[in-house]
Regions:
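Short, solvent-exposed loop/linker segments at the N-terminal edge
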Residues: 1, 6-14
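C-terminal edge beta-strand
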Residues: 89-101
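A glycine-rich, often tryptophan-bearing local segment used as a flexible ligand/cofactor-contacting loop or short
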Residues: 134, 186-276
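Extracellular ligand-binding/catalytic regions of CAZymes and related secreted enzymes
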Residues: 102-104, 111, 115-121, 235, ...
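Surface-exposed binding patches on compact interaction domains or structured appendages
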Residues: 1-2, 18-64
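A short beta-strand micro-motif common to beta-rich folds, especially ectodomain repeats
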Residues: 74-88
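Catalytic beta-strand/loop cores that center a nucleophilic Ser/Cys/Thr
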Residues: 239-330
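Aromatic-Pro/Gly-enriched surface loop or interdomain linker
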Residues: 101-179, 324-325, 340, 354, ...
Length: 368
């Protein structure tokens, strides 16, 4: 048997669908068919046409269907059929690639006005970003990067600043946002009740993302206590021990250095290290309970995680507020930090950070 007879792909080139195949007859064949089920061509071990490929993986226990073109026609579905034949058994399968209006959704991102790293507001009542967020703000608001015709297709980013009011933030407020960034906000200003509501907001929908700062011992402690639930292993540094090198390359972090939309033509160099702006940052120590489920992207001089993602929980762990700054700081070069406020992607640092937000954007658009 197979897990599904209909595969629905996103509108983008490279969108994939998976069919699990349960059979002892792993030499089964594949053949294109028309809308009436009439076979076309001859049976084969893989299929390819102008729009889709169908290939076997894992000794035939999986079929991977991949879109070869974008479907950008409003209201249209691109449909193709194929047949699986295993001796006397035949199974008719349909592929649909839908135009996806979600791709043009505007992403609503909240950060907090009283904390370092505040991203500012770019809609009614526009306000500037705090100095440690000017580089990232430029990347997010430049529609060459994130926009209807951008590298990542979406409606763009609405950045909204909110004032903190310990234990008085509401569920209704959080519900307005797709992404919440708890920037460098003092622990006294973001209470345990706020943290609990934010955690519930995150768990309620699969297309919401939390960015959690852990830059110092006096910020985000109520949030960390909520999302890590008694786990330990975060260390806070108050001296500059050097830059933040890439974590060891794995399938889990390859997106940010190589496979993501901002690095497909020019990957991040393997010896890249992001500059460590000042003496303060936090690290989630590896092989501790706090690090469980987190894929490392950047490591700190203390051997812990400065930037990482928990994919299953949709949490980005952001250990240094200054990663989003365009200011030089300690040990800066033209390559090792975001070096402009216009959002120009012109070095390894900007490509890496842009890919992190590409993953965030795709999760908001296509999280299920």
């Amino acid at each position: 048997g197979i897990s599904t007879r209909e595969v629905v792909l996103k509108h983008k080139t490279g969108s994939e669908g998976i069919i699990s195949v349960s059979t002892d007859l792993l030499d089964y064949t594949l053949q294109w068919a028309d809308d009436a089920g009439v076979l076309q061509g001859t049976g084969a071990q893989s299929l390819s046409n102008d729009y889709f490929t169908v290939t076997k993986e894992d000794n035939g226990s999986r079929l991977v269907i991949t879109a070869l073109q974008n479907n950008l026609a409003d209201g249209s579905n691109r449909i193709q059929h194929f047949v699986i034949t295993a001796q006397r058994w035949t199974i008719y399968v349909s592929i649909q690639q839908k135009y996806d209006i979600a791709a043009y959704k505007t992403i609503n991102l909240m950060s907090f006005t009283s904390g370092l790293g505040y991203l500012g507001t770019n809609i009614l009542g526009s306000s500037s970003a705090e100095a440690r967020a000017t580089g990232l703000r430029g990347i997010l608001t430049n529609q060459t990067n994130f926009g209807p015709d951008g590298v990542v297709e979406c409606g763009g980013y609405n950045l909204v600043g909110v004032g903190v009011n310990a234990n008085n933030l509401t569920d209704a407020l959080f519900s307005l946002f797709d992404v919440v960034y708890i920037n460098y906000v003092p622990t006294s200003q973001f209470g345990s009740q706020d943290a609990h509501k934010l955690h519930n907001w995150l768990k309620t929908k699969k297309n919401r993302v939390l960015i959690a700062s852990y830059d110092a011992s006096d910020v985000s402690q109520n949030l960390l206590a909520e999302i890590l639930a008694g786990k330990s292993g975060i260390k806070y540094f108050t001296s500059n021990g050097g830059p933040y090198p890439l974590a060891a390359s794995t399938i889990g972090n390859h997106y940010f250095t190589t496979d993501g939309p901002f690095t497909k033509n020019a990957p991040v160099t393997s010896n890249f290290a992001l500059r460590n702006y000042d003496i303060y940052h936090g690290e989630i120590q590896v092989n501790t309970s706090a690090s469980e489920g987190i894929t490392p992207i950047l490591m700190g001089p203390g051997g812990g995680i400065v930037l990482g993602i928990d994919y299953s929980r949709r949490i980005v762990y952001w250990g240094d507020t200054d990663m989003s700054s365009n200011l030089s700081g300690t040990g800066a070069t033209s390559e090792n930090h975001i070096n402009n406020t216009a959002g120009t992607i012109n070095n390894d640092a900007s490509k890496l950070i842009a890919n992190v937000f590409a993953w965030i954007t795709e999760t908001v658009l296509y999280g299920e």
